[in-house]
Swiss-Prot record:
Stated family: Belongs to the ketol-acid reductoisomerase family.
Residues reported in the UniProt entry to bind Mg(2+) 1: D191, E195
The protein, known as: Ketol-acid reductoisomerase (NADP(+))
Enzyme class: oxidoreductase
GO BP terms: isoleucine biosynthetic process; L-valine biosynthetic process
InterPro entries associated with the record: 6-PGluconate_DH-like_C_sf, KARI, KARI_C, KARI_N, KARI_prok, NAD(P)-bd_dom_sf
Gene coding for it: ilvC
Organism: Methanococcoides burtonii (strain DSM 6242 / NBRC 107633 / OCM 468 / ACE-M)
Taxonomic lineage: Archaea, Methanobacteriati, Methanobacteriota, Stenosarchaea group, Methanomicrobia
Co-factor requirement: Mg(2+)
Amino acid sequence: MVEMFYDKDADLGALKGKIIAVMGYGSQGHAQAQNLHDSGLDVVIGLREGSRRWKQAEDDGLKVMTVADAAKAADVVQILLPDEIQSKVYYSEIEPGLEAGNSLVFSHGFNIHYNQIVPSKDLDVYMVAPKSPGHLVRRTYKEGAGVPGLIAVYQDASGNALEMALAHAKGVGCTRAGVIETTFREETETDLFGEQVDLCGGVASLIKTSFEVLVEAGYQPEMAYFETLHELKLIVDLIHEGGLEKMWYSVSNTAEYGGLTVGPQIINEESREAMYVALERIQNGEFAREFVLEGQTNHAVLTSMERLEKEHPVEVVGKKLRAMMPWLNSELNEE
């Protein structure tokens, strides 16, 4: 059984008296920075000059500097920028301001694991990764709770990197729910696999293909949308709350029998083999190299694929149907 760490296992004193620079103020940046600040820690935000987030961070009560100035001022530098720009920003603006004994913090291991960033050996390098979107990281913290998270130590120059990671996780609020110790390799490879095979790639392809099959068979696109996309949230919520067991218990006998007998015919051995191929590309660095090159071409392929996604019939139909359901916007705004 994996070991869990909680509030009692972490001491914020490991970060007291240190300046923490959070680079970026997006989904995770705004949440983690505010939580750290509200936990009594000294936080500054690093942003590029002219960033639209600058005023937002100041309005939230945080001190804002350029990335370079924040790196020079800080003892602990947390990089919460998009994966594809981290390396460039690190070498041009962050590394020149670092000193021996400083700590470098990530919430995703991509750039460390795939050697896009190779830190000096005199730095501590650790990870604090909340397993939740930023708005929930912030909301649950304000409610007195927290979201589960991961910690990992890549480099322990000081001998205190684990204590620092636990303190950082406590400041973010993750030790209230519990954190698991992992490695940069394990976090990166499992995270990418989940995104590609299940959460983003697999689900999106399943929705589009099943929608296309129904429409090609002569069913109304609106009916196909409701059955293959809209109702998915109802099922996912049940799984999220109580696992597959709660979902099977909650649906009709017809749905349970059909799902258990037909599901394995859809996601079959051929699908399993494709998953292993995807995992191998992640493990051997092939996907990382492809993604880095994609970033160097200003995301030409990604931009083209995004356009095709927007034009897919399930999106065209869905946009019209969602306009009939104003409560969906209310739910998004609440989050």
